Amino acid sequence: FETQLELRQQDKLDEKVFAETRLRRGVYGQRYDNGQRHDGVAVRAIEFPSSSLTKGPDTAWDAPGMQRIKIPFGGVTPEQLEVLADLAEEYSDGILHVTTRQDFQLHFIHIEDTPDLMRRLGAVGITSREACGNTVRNITACPIAGVCRDETFDVTPYSLAMADFLLGHPDAQDFGRKFKVAFSGCAGKACALVNMHDLGFIAR
């Protein structure tokens, strides 16, 4: 990724070719249609609801983007949360967004910062690989899996095993866009909205 980023910065790699690489690493471009940014020029500071946080007047608005961070079944450790919080403060707007697929997202990320950000995530066992693009998206599970009184068994180990198996698997690199998988630990219940996924597994 870092090599392709350097080639892209040197105008030696087509933007469309690089886009496929960055999407597979969870790096999105962001566009603003409300006057906040146009062609890389800030016309006013971005304001956040119920907060005084902005990116600040000294930010170089060179098309900041979004970094999606893959968290299988939403399982995260205290150490990982500390690192995620630090990255939100250092590279983003101080806000760590939680997604409906149990991922995290950092907005207003500069593409030049993404290699260091990815290295720091990797140091605590987190990846952004295949968080976007034509791959299997984050494997989700019941939000209270492992502690639910009604579950048949804890499905989180199965969610993690499938995530590990599919990550980088050659047969899962050119799926249809947003191929999604979820696990439910409750027999006869569509917890984690498994009935709305491409593959939904229900414990029995």
Each model region followed by its residue ranges:
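Charge-rich, low-complexity segments
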Residues: 1-52, 191-194
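Small-residue-enriched alpha-helical segments and adjacent helix-cap loops
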Residues: 6, 30-31, 37-43, 64-204
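N-terminal glycine-rich anion-binding loops that anchor highly charged ligand groups
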Residues: 48-64
